[in-house]
Every structure is written in C-alpha cells, then in structure tokens.
Amino acid sequence: MFLAQEIIRKKRDGHALSDEEIRFFINGIRDNTISEGQIAALAMTIFFHDMTMPERVSLTMAMRDSGTVLDWKSLHLNGPIVDKHSTGGVGDVTSLMLGPMVAACGGYIPMISGRGLGHTGGTLDKLESIPGFDIFPDDNRFREIIKDVGVAIIGQTSSLAPADKRFYATRDITATVDSIPLITASILAKKLAEGLDALVMDVKVGSGAFMPTYELSEALAEAIVGVANGAGVRTTALLTDMNQVLASSAGNAVEVREAVQFLTGEYRNPRLFDVTMALCVEMLISGKLAKDDAEARAKLQAVLDNGKAAEVFGRMVAAQKGPTDFVENYAKYLPTAMLTKAVYADTEGFVSEMDTRALGMAVVAMGGGRRQASDTIDYSVGFTDMARLGDQVDGQRPLAVIHAKDENSWQDAAKAVKAAIKLADKAPESTPTVYRRISE
C-alpha cells in the first residue's frame, strides 16, 4: 500500500519512482482517490526532475492500462495493426490519404483521432464536414469496419486511457503541459490502447509546430520512439516541416476536398505527397508489408494509380454512415462558403516566410475551429490555393483564396493572411519536407 504524498515527496526529492508506485498513482487518478492538488504536485515535480526511461515506460503503460486496450486477435486479420500520430499542424490532412493507402496495401488502421486544438486542425472535425459521417460507431461496428474495409477513423471514447483525460485537464491549468515525459505518456497511452503492432510518429518542426524549436521537437520524437519501443510496439518517427501550410488548403471541407483529389489523382500538392508517402513507407516497413523503401513506394504508388486507395476511402466513408458515392460526387456533398474570393499581396515579391500558426488561428477566427470546447464549427470556411515558400506573388498570383461566411469575416482573414506571409526580393532556399528519421 502506498501513500500519494510519499510518492510525490520521493519524486520531489529527485528519486526515480517504481513501476508499482506509478501504477498506484495513475489508478488513483482514474478512481478519483487521488486529488487534483496531488495530480498537480506530481506533474510539477516531473516537470522539474524529468523521468528516467523505465519511469516513462511505466507511466505510459499505466495510463494505457487505466482503460480498455483493444485486442484484435479474435478477428484473425491477415495483416498488421498499424497507425500514425501527428503532433498537429495546419493543412495537415495526411491521415485521410494515409489510412486508405496503407489499408489498400494490406494493413489495418484503427485510427483514434482528435479534434482541433489551438491553431491545429482536427481530423475528426474535417471528417464531420462529410454529411452523416459517424465518428462514434459502437465497438462492434468499429471492429467490423476494420475487418471489412481495413481502416476506420473514430473519436476517443471515454473507455480509452481515462486517466489521461483527468491528468491532462490538471496539467492544462497548472503550466505543466510542456513536459516531455508527460506529453509522451499522454500521446502514447491513447495510441497504444489501440492494440498496435507498429506506429509512426509525425513530429512537426517550425512556425506551425506544437513544439517551439527544432531541438524540442527532436527530443519529443526521440522520447516517443524510446518509450513506444520499450512498451513493445515497433515505432519510428519523422521530423517533418511545418514552416508553411502543408496542403494547398487549410480548413475542414476544403481539406477533405483536397484529400479526395489527392487519392483520385486529380491534384496532388508535392509537399503533401512527400510527407504522406514518407509516413506510409514507415508504416509498411514497420508493419512488415514491405522490406525496404523502394518496395514500399512501389506498392503505395500502385494503389494510388489503380484507384484502390480512393476506393478504400469511399468504403470507409460509406461504412461510417457517409454518402455511398462520396468520392465520385464530393463537390455535391461538401458545404461551401458564402463568399469565396482571392487575397493579393500589396507588393510583388517572393514568399520568404510564413507564420503558419497565425494562419491556423485565422481559420479558427473565421469559425473553422474552436476557441472553447462548446463552440460549433463552420465546416465551409478556410483557405485554398495557398501560396508556398518561394512562390512569386503579384496582382495575378494570390496569397490565398479565402472561403468566408461574409465580407467582414473575409476582410479579417485577408488582413491575417497578409500579416502572416512575408515577401522578399528573391526566393528563399528550399527546405526539406522530412528533416530526419528517428528509429530505436
């Protein structure tokens, strides 16, 4: 039997906690036998004293085990259970293509996703712009879709890692969110509850990233790879660029439109293609569906070219109560904004810098994201035809096309876009889309 205050004292004094102590504390968070003050105190001691790798693994596993852990054995699936998690960005619509592409190559992707957070868009919000799309199928239906289609993207239910929800709420109001061991456990508790064989992490770097510096993004990626492999799940991470909007669009319906166009081959933004392919390659190799980069890329290109990936996306939408002909007729189903008009730079020049975070916040301000959990979303608003770093802009080539609910909203968004995009006399050096791959 342990005492919560003794566990806090031990960590306060800079000592490592045992697996049993960590499990006792996390179970107490779940059962409400540990107070909010005690959660706050432990979070702050971890913030200042960090955790050893064994402590980080124990914390993650205890949080995972605080709720249901999915088990796929009874379905006798003939492929690996794999998933991807992104730290979030703007125009980061990779999940919508990646899930179907990997499923078309023989993987099974039970993706439990999130809503928008701060300036970053949420995969669930994007999918809810599809009429009828059900992000909360019951457990049996979720399993059926995984077995039949190969991929489902759903919201987090209360039975998955419940201790994380309470722990996170306390961290949020006590300035202890940005602690690498706590972020790692929070992300992985939910992902590892999916019962995965392999995981790839997309850790963003740059002006639209969750972590403020390259070094911190790298430290988070290394921590996640270390802990997840320590917990028995083959995991790699890619550090990818978020110094500009990843897709050509940012919003909800506009990003779903771009995802469908990507899958059908109608339009593929080169940077979005690079990042999506790189993540899919990791999933295929870690999931043992391909032996190397070349084989993985060939398989992925084939399912894009032969229409299989687009077909899987359509089947997922239909299985989750969306329209059965969505891929063919997406334009008919997706909501459109009242006012669609381009915004131009005041001078001509080359796009040299982008405050990606500010562009994400501009989408939120237009109604495309939430400032608080109770807000409703306008799925139709956002940006399309975004200029990219190095593009020449003038009176002919706009900075973006703004999809707004009215003229006032358009004016505010136009101001935000102009302020967020800097121009120079010459094009900047091009930056890579993938900076580094991190494996165990």
Curated annotation (Swiss-Prot):
The EC designation for this entry is 2.4.2.4
The similarity annotation says:
Belongs to the thymidine/pyrimidine-nucleoside phosphorylase family.
- Family annotation (Gene3D superfamilies): Nucleoside phosphorylase/phosphoribosyltransferase catalytic domain (3.40.1030.10), Pyrimidine nucleoside phosphorylase-like, C-terminal domain (3.90.1170.30), Transferase, Pyrimidine Nucleoside Phosphorylase, Chain C (1.20.970.10)
Report the Pfam families cross-referenced here: Glycos_trans_3N (PF02885), Glycos_transf_3 (PF00591), PYNP_C (PF07831)
Q: What does this protein do?
A: The enzymes which catalyze the reversible phosphorolysis of pyrimidine nucleosides are involved in the degradation of these compounds and in their utilization as carbon and energy sources, or in the rescue of pyrimidine bases for nucleotide synthesis.
* The name this protein goes by in its record: Thymidine phosphorylase
Q: According to the UniProt record, what class of enzyme is this?
A: transferase
Q: Does the keyword Glycosyltransferase apply?
A: yes
Catalysis: reaction(s): thymidine + phosphate = 2-deoxy-alpha-D-ribose 1-phosphate + thymine
Q: Listed GO molecular functions?
A: 1,4-alpha-oligoglucan phosphorylase activity; thymidine phosphorylase activity
Q: Which SUPFAM superfamilies match?
A: Nucleoside phosphorylase/phosphoribosyltransferase catalytic domain (SSF52418), Nucleoside phosphorylase/phosphoribosyltransferase N-terminal domain (SSF47648), Pyrimidine nucleoside phosphorylase C-terminal domain (SSF54680)
Q: Which keywords appear in this protein's UniProt record, sorted alphabetically?
A: Glycosyltransferase, Transferase
Pathway connected to this protein? Pyrimidine metabolism; dTMP biosynthesis via salvage pathway; dTMP from thymine: step 1/2
- Provide the species name: Escherichia coli (strain 55989 / EAEC)
- GO annotation, biological process: pyrimidine nucleobase metabolic process; thymidine metabolic process
